[in-house]
Swiss-Prot record:
Belongs to the UPF0128 family. InterPro entries: UPF0128. It comes from Pyrococcus horikoshii (strain ATCC 700860 / DSM 12428 / JCM 9974 / NBRC 100139 / OT-3). Signal peptide: none annotated. This is UPF0128 protein PH1314.
Length: 225
């Protein structure tokens, strides 16, 4: 849904925020983890450790349990799925990650998503996301204020081609990548060859753990700089 309301250009896809999502090995790597096959207390299991921290053949104790690394996976096993979801407990968000192998579920981690997102964005140099994030829960809010000279926001018909291209990119992200989102935009023209604008963008947090989607969102946030 697209509408213009009192100087605000709004792109809204009011779909359902997904309960869980499938991820790839490249995403897990971007989060800063290795995936291992081995044993926990002698029972076959998949588990994770920080990148490069554990090695094949190593046995160690973590939180009172004995872990043995038989193999460090290069890919997600063909008969398994890497899944994650955002949950809210006592007002705080958590990212739960697990591996499903047929009917068996192997819990991998439960962490504050803000910590992992910050780690990803710093590692991948996604500076727009780092700078403009405002809130993280089931959804994540970004706010960017590039208003140098306050005035009356322009109607869509007066937007220059570069601004319209940004709006098309936002529509594509909502339609093709996230299925949900709300983008609110005000444009005040150019000042000294710099675009004068303000935006608010809400996206499902879970999708931002997909490194390709995170890169696309970061790119769009920086297109008018």
């Amino acid at each position: 849904m697209i509408k213009m309301l009192e100087g605000y250009y709004i792109i809204e896809n009011p779909g359902v925020v997904p309960a869980e999502r499938r991820f790839r090995m490249k995403d897990l790597k971007a989060w800063g983890y290795d995936l291992h096959l081995g044993t926990i207390e002698g029972e076959r299991a998949y588990f994770i450790s920080k990148t490069g921290e554990r090695h094949e053949g190593e046995t160690y104790i973590f939180k009172g349990k004995e872990y043995h690394v038989s193999r460090t996976q290069k890919e997600i096993p063909e008969n398994a799925r890497l899944l994650a979801r955002i949950i809210i407990e006592r007002g705080n968000p958590y990212l739960e990650v697990w591996l499903e192998e047929e009917d068996v579920k192997f819990p991998l981690t439960k962490e504050d998503p803000r910590i992992i997102l910050k780690r990803i964005w710093e590692k991948e140099k996604l500076n727009q996301l780092l700078k403009h994030v405002r809130a993280v829960g089931l959804t994540t809010d970004f706010y960017k204020d590039n208003v140098f000279t306050q005035g009356i926001p322009l109607p869509y018909e007066e937007y220059p081609p570069k601004v319209r291209r940004v709006l098309r990119e936002v529509k594509d992200i909502h339609r093709d990548l996230t299925g949900f989102g709300r983008f609110v935009f005000q444009y005040f023209g150019e000042v000294d060859k710099m675009h004068n604008y303000r935006l608010y963008w809400t996206l499902p947090t879970l999708h931002l753990f997909d490194i390709d989607i995170a890169n696309e969102v970061d790119k769009v946030l920086g297109m008018l700089d």
